[in-house]
Amino acid sequence: MLERLENCEKRFREIEEEISKPEVINDARLVRTLAQERADLQTKVEMYRRYKAISKELEDTKNLLEIEKDEDMKDMVRGEIASLEKSMADLYTQMTLELLPKDPNDDKSIIMEIRAGTGGDEAGLFAADLYKMYTRYALLKNWKTEVIDINGNVAGIIKEVVFEVNGKGAFSRLKYERGVHRVQRVPQTEASGRIHTSTATVAVLPQVEEVDIDINMDDVRVDIFHSSGAGGQNVQKVATAIRLTHIPTGLVVCCQDERSQLKNKNKAFAVLRARLMELEQSKVDEERTESRRAQVGQADRSEKIRTYNFPQDRLTDHRIGLTAHNLPHILEGYLDEIIDTLATHEQTELLKGED
């Protein structure tokens, strides 16, 4: 690992020399490329330089211990050595984490899809709870959310909702939420007090720029229809809702949230690009990302990543055996503790692969 960091430092010095050359300064594109590479290396290099400085200080302190005669002074020096060794060990771990491969999508905004699974109306109410939880979480992170399509009713039941979460790092945090979520609780309409089990699926797709994926328009059927929303003169007079069908894959995307046909079309294509990119990436690297269909599973009660048990006020994440309490607090969007634990577990597994 230290050899890799030495190479990083060498490249960092080369970039600093190159970026000051007149022929480079006049090439704006090259300057941006080099500046980005330097920024990517900077944290690693700063850590490595600090590590070397502590290593040199530790060596000098050990030499001092060998020549020191006074026992009280020796005790002080031993304490200093222990402190320096701990600093080096901590820094070594940080450097190892910094060198782990990064998900190229981590900084991206996302498209999130929530669908009610098994459980009838109770599943729809649970899907609505999840939607509220994620929008509240986005608010706490100062991210913006925007609905693309929603299929629900006035009773608070959501069959399906597709929405954007726009903010740097949204994918790095919310990617851990994809999969089947299960709820166990007594419905308000259940007179006997019997606990019902329901599910909802969550898909998290990184947003894809138009330049990142090429869609052949001959492969897309565009249908325009009247919105099934609240109604009004706009719905009566103008068909603004859009349905896209990608013929080769069978993917279907609908958007009817906006009153503008153009805005609905743009949003629908954004979702289609994200879904197509997910399918493409799943073929290229099955270990890093699954296909969208595998991601959300079949939403039956046996498949699950997480269970929300209301009678026991307990959340269980089955992937890592995590247990948390205070469901009302969690459902208000306070997810960082759970997500931090999942991220740490992922880093630990990656470190095992490095060993």
Swiss-Prot record:
InterPro entries attached to this UniProt entry: PCRF, Pep_chain_release_fac_I, Pep_chain_release_fac_I_sf, Prokaryotic/Mito_RF, RF-1
Protein name: Peptide chain release factor 1
Pfam families cross-referenced by the UniProt entry: PCRF, RF-1
GO MF annotation: an example: translation release factor activity, codon specific
Coiled-coil ranges per UniProt: none
Function: Peptide chain release factor 1 directs the termination of translation in response to the peptide chain termination codons UAG and UAA.
Keywords (A to Z) from UniProt: Cytoplasm, Methylation, Protein biosynthesis
Subcellular locations according to the entry: Cytoplasm
